[in-house]
């Protein structure tokens, strides 16, 4: 690490309101990216029918997109750790917006696949470069808590994608893609006015020097890669995602699982899509408890260096029995077939109370997701704790690459 002395850096804004605005924009960007990820699975059936292809080919699109996004993230992160991160984030957002818009305009399967892969390239930027930026806003003491919000924003985005895809796309599957494209362009414009966050500014060891006008000018190089992989903590943080995400990757099929259950009970395709999306959204609400996992991780980390790892491991292992119950317990669906979207949604929500099998399934899912969500904020925080500022984006992207392979494998196996 090196510090260069000089005049205090001139950065536009940087007051409390400006920093808060910047954090909000980052969170929204992370959410929108995951809306894009969650948009396709609820619409597998409708898109497959439109292009006259089997649903498994739409599952292949999702699996390959995971891989492309993960590979692209490594390149984005490496350049983000070397250069100004703000332009990279804006370019990445524009790329995924263009790919999402192209998906909505596609007239055949190959065009849809190409557009989704273009979007995946852009999505890789926001996750990896955005992570590097956010860690420079957070002091080590509160990393678990703030990273829980970062992870929560992504989870909410995925839920929103599932819900938006099912509700807006039940009649016309192209509509949600076009709506999301506009949202991506608006987010890019909002990002123009965010605070330029200085690399390393959240580190207590650098605070005094940076306040005195020094610049943290160390940048990653290829010579650093052996050092990064030589850290045992990094190796475990990267590799654990292969098996974990093989399981998590299959969760993108939840809307399809519940939609097919509805079809098996005689409901029409349009009603089944809405039912699948609403049930999948409800059943993943337990992810909001990642905040609790982050708080517990922060508290335990102050007592022992393995605190965050213990919280994450216990959460994942404890969730396994609940997932088994969720997937195999039968569920009776009672909604008005052919009714409007609002009526179907109200019926689904009412069935949580009126239908015991639905209530049991929801409780099981909430517990499973609540326990699993302890992993995300503590994984993020451990990467930041174990690495200097110029390495964090790259380490995150390497972990994300392995996660992407696991997600693609899980998605492909289920599909």
Please place each PLM-identified region on the residue numbering:
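Juxtamembrane intracellular "pre-TM" segments in multi-pass secondary transporters
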Residues: 3-16, 198-238, 348-350
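Helix-loop-helix hairpin linking two adjacent transmembrane segments in secondary transporters
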Residues: 150-199
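Residue-level signature of mid-helix packing/kink "hotspots" within the transmembrane helices
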Residues: 38, 66-74, 124, 158-159, ...
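Helix-breaking motifs and short loop linkers at transmembrane-helix boundaries and internal kinks
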Residues: 52, 84, 105-111, 122, ...
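Conserved MFS/SLC helix-loop-helix module at the cytosolic interface between two early adjacent transmembrane helices
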Residues: 71-110
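Extracytoplasmic gate region of multi-pass secondary transporters
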Residues: 40-41, 231-286, 290-291, 376, ...
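Cytoplasmic helix-loop-helix junction between adjacent transmembrane helices
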Residues: 115-156
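Structural signature of the two symmetry-related core transmembrane helices
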Residues: 87-101, 307-324
